[in-house]
Amino acid sequence: MFSLLNMYRKVLELPLSFLVKNNPIPHHPIEELKLDPTQPMVYVLPYTSQTDLVIFRKNCLSVGLPDPLEKNEIEGKSLPRFVFLDEGRRFFKSKGAKEETIQVFNQYLELHHQRSDLDVQIIPVSVLWGRSPGHEKQSGLPQLRLLSGLQKFIAAVWFGRDTFVRFSQAVSLRYMVNEHGSDQAISHKLARVAKIHFSKQRISATGPRLPNREAMFNKLLASPTILDAIQDEAKAKNISEEKATQEAKKILDEIAANVNYEGLRVADRFLRWLWNKLYQGIDVQNADRVRKLALDGHEIVYVPCHRSHIDYLLLSYVLYHQGLVPPHIAAGINLNFWPVGGMFRRGGAFFIRRTFKGNRLYSTIFREYLAELFHRGYSVEYFIEGGRSRTGRLLAPKTGMMSMTLQALLQGQTRPISVVPVYVGYEHVLEVDTYAKELRGAAKEKENAGLVLRVIKKLRNLGKGYVNFGEPITLSNYLNQHYPEWKENTQAEERAKWFNQAVDSISHQVMVNINKAAAVNAMNLTGTALLSSRQRALSREQLLEQLESYQQFLQNVPYSQDIVVPTESPEKMLEHILQLERVGIIVEKDNFGEIVRLERNSAVLMTYYRNNIQHLFVLPSLVASIVLHYEAIQKPLVLEAVSKIYPFLKSELFLSFSYEELQDRVNHIITEFERQEVIKCNANMLSINKPRVRMLQLWSSGVREILQRYYITVSILEKDPATPRASLEKDSQSVAQRLSVLHGINAPEFFDKAVFSAFIASLKQEGYFNEEGIANTEKLNEITEILNQVISTEVCLTIKGAIAKIEEE
């Protein structure tokens, strides 16, 4: 019998090797699930299926896991390395697990009595044939069931490329024995837990059934809230309710997604081709925390930063290949053009207008549609910045979608809602040339199919893409901690007292968590180093030395536990960047060696990639700048200076450190600079280390332009503390534009009005204005004293000269 079974498996191997692709989830289970290769493993499959076993074994061997067909040899006993939970034709038709499976569990538990160092790892595994959730009112059981031979053959042909093997978090038998004992009841408990786990796993991979679009529309149009809005629309426009209802249907049709599973499969193949054409791979980190949320039944809201139109596609592609359900995505109405609008809609996009202002019917329908998505259990994605960042920095959050998300929770959403911040990064952004033109004043080109094709056609070899899932925010937990009154059954007017504050606070925390999940790449680091040189050029040796300094700093003084730092050597990073197309980096040779420099037109483009990680280096840059300009300074004075500037940096760059953590952070920075010999530290005195002064100069450059902007605004206020806010913003912008021309500053955000507006708001929040809006010059002088020391005399004179000219006008 045993040999016949082996022969049968061998017969299955040949066709399945051609038809079914290896798709393990996660892709590196040993590392991502923290499995211990020195301890035995036992794989648990949901039901008896030799086909599934063959596919599962193939995936095991491809990722370096022990062969499931081999035995575990423990204390002279030879025990199976895999078990099937259920024998039935349908998923878990029988009430209990297979008796032989219980016996195997019992034997493993008994061995834990004999060996105190033994810790068998029980690993639930399931094979997913396709990921279609089906449609509402569709008959049939979930797809996690034993298929007949013919059904399996059809599934292998049709879903072979979309078959996934899902490895779950291991259960420690040692933990089970220590906590619950080792009698036979524990074996049955293990089996029950595994059954529940497999059911949850299937739902987390496919999501709820897809809606019947027409039935969903009818339900929404019959809701009291939308009916009231329709009646108000009819009265306001003096039209019949029937006509207003037709308008409501048009709005719903404009907004709503029309998800099609087969469309997703086709899109997956197209996207696989696209990534292979454009990029050298997609690096994904921390997907396990999202899989855990899905298994625990959370409603997941993905909130990524917005770098490119391709973000929409990238995140859905990544989630699909991480065994998660692609979300419904809030996309700008500008993307609803032929033919991609229909493709996006079938892939889960629902479209949103740029503004809801003055259109109550539209805003009501959109809000109710979003609430319905939450109610039905669909994951949702939206870009909290509202649009793509043209500068590479995070934009101030637009809170409308977050407000509607919180409203859905307050309306009685039963499942917990967790917001997952997502950092998306690229070594080359498709639209970066367009961004540079727009920042120089060119009109934004309207999206259309021709534009998309032109962009894709001319680009290839763009390096890597990065997706890092940040620390989730479970809304109910956040509200319990910060706004405990949220559970009280209050009227909308009373709720507004804390509701708006909560929306702003959560939105800000999302931005902070996105920055905490930054994925640093070779382009970010190389751009940062070259832009730190006034000539945008460094010798090859200087550049490699600076790259190594950045890399070691991020490894030894990590910004957060979620940050991703390149592991390649500086030489390999530079070699990689030079091989990419359209980066604008040139290598020249002279009698002394090689010089690496930026092309004249590439400096603005490179600031985009520097700005992606500017928040990681702004504090060490400030410390370096203070030491460089003072030449020798006591550590307490450095801490004092940093503490005065930090509130503005924290607000502008969404920094994560609290004021209580700031001193420790600065001390860690100083310790690392001393270790790298960038500075010298004698007792409490910090000073320049002359042999490494060039490195200190490069480190200090990261904050230079930010401090110059602060100095502009503060200097205007010192001249006239009563300057109206609108004039203050306008004059600050004018001075910055002049400074950028005279001193060759290429950073596109340097004279951005929004940046000055945010700084002025921070000044107000920190108490630098009185109730009448008059600046407190005594308090401003504290900042000026610091800025006067760390900004060059030449720049200070240019700023003061420009301000004097404004006063003359």
UniProtKB/Swiss-Prot annotation:
Catalytic activity: sn-glycerol 3-phosphate + an acyl-CoA = a 1-acyl-sn-glycero-3-phosphate + CoA
Group of enzyme by EC: transferase
Keyword Cell membrane (UniProt): yes
Protein's membrane topology: Peripheral membrane protein
Family annotation (CDD domains): LPLAT_DHAPAT-like
Localization of this protein: Cell inner membrane
GO annotation, cellular component aspect: plasma membrane
Pathway(s) where this gene product acts: Phospholipid metabolism; CDP-diacylglycerol biosynthesis; CDP-diacylglycerol from sn-glycerol 3-phosphate: step 1/3
Motif mapping: HXXXXD motif: 306-311
InterPro entries: GPAT/DHAPAT, GPAT/DHAPAT_C, GPAT/DHAPAT_LPLAT, GPAT_PlsB, Plipid/glycerol_acylTrfase
Family annotation (SUPFAM superfamilies): Glycerol-3-phosphate (1)-acyltransferase
Molecular-function GO terms, alphabetical: glycerol-3-phosphate O-acyltransferase activity
GO biological process terms on file: CDP-diacylglycerol biosynthetic process; fatty acid metabolic process
Enzyme nomenclature, EC number: 2.3.1.15
Keyword annotations: Acyltransferase, Cell inner membrane, Cell membrane, Lipid biosynthesis, Lipid metabolism, Membrane, Phospholipid biosynthesis, Phospholipid metabolism, Transferase
PANTHER family: DIHYDROXYACETONE PHOSPHATE ACYLTRANSFERASE (PTHR12563:SF17), GLYCEROL-3-PHOSPHATE ACYLTRANSFERASE (PTHR12563)
Family: Belongs to the GPAT/DAPAT family.
Domain notes: The HXXXXD motif is essential for acyltransferase activity and may constitute the binding site for the phosphate moiety of the glycerol-3-phosphate.
NCBIfam families cross-referenced by the UniProt entry: plsB, PRK04974.1
Name assigned to this protein: Glycerol-3-phosphate acyltransferase
Organism: Pasteurella multocida (strain Pm70)
